[in-house]
């Protein structure tokens, strides 16, 4: 389903933990990393597509996450010319994305990259909040920057509400 401007409707998913870190996933058989994302099927809402992609790509269901926010607007990126499939009609020149910020409420053990017969990812890790903006492939960087900027206050408020470790001897440093 490509729109009149040549963009494919898509959802993007940022999953965070209580420490304000975000899940960063390695594309299957590649050295590139990104957030989970995927197309919206005909007749499917953005939220329905998000839950479907969440399960297909990282094995999580509704009970494992809580929706914290979604982007106000659709965000677009163009594909580099070398990635455009010119032989398909209509030609897709990029993606228009609705992004969701989710908090993982179950444990890390629930994450499973192998739920699909054709997995998108083969590994993942928690990274600092702004890390993906610097590391994602260049043609997605502007969208990632906008997404992370829009979601930042929500994620930072999670961190503020997370109990801090007690000041025990394990955390003390001798001053001299």
Curated annotation (Swiss-Prot):
A motif (Nudix box) lies at residues 38-59. Its EC number is 3.6.1.-. GO terms for cellular component: cytoplasm. HAMAP family: Nudix_RppH (MF_00298). InterPro entries: Nudix_hydrolase, NUDIX_hydrolase-like_dom_sf, NUDIX_hydrolase_CS, NUDIX_hydrolase_dom, RppH. One of its GO terms (molecular function) is mRNA 5'-diphosphatase activity. The gene is rppH. Belongs to the Nudix hydrolase family. RppH subfamily. CDD domains: NUDIX_Ap4A_hydrolase_plant_like. This is RNA pyrophosphohydrolase. Residues 6-149 form the Nudix hydrolase domain.
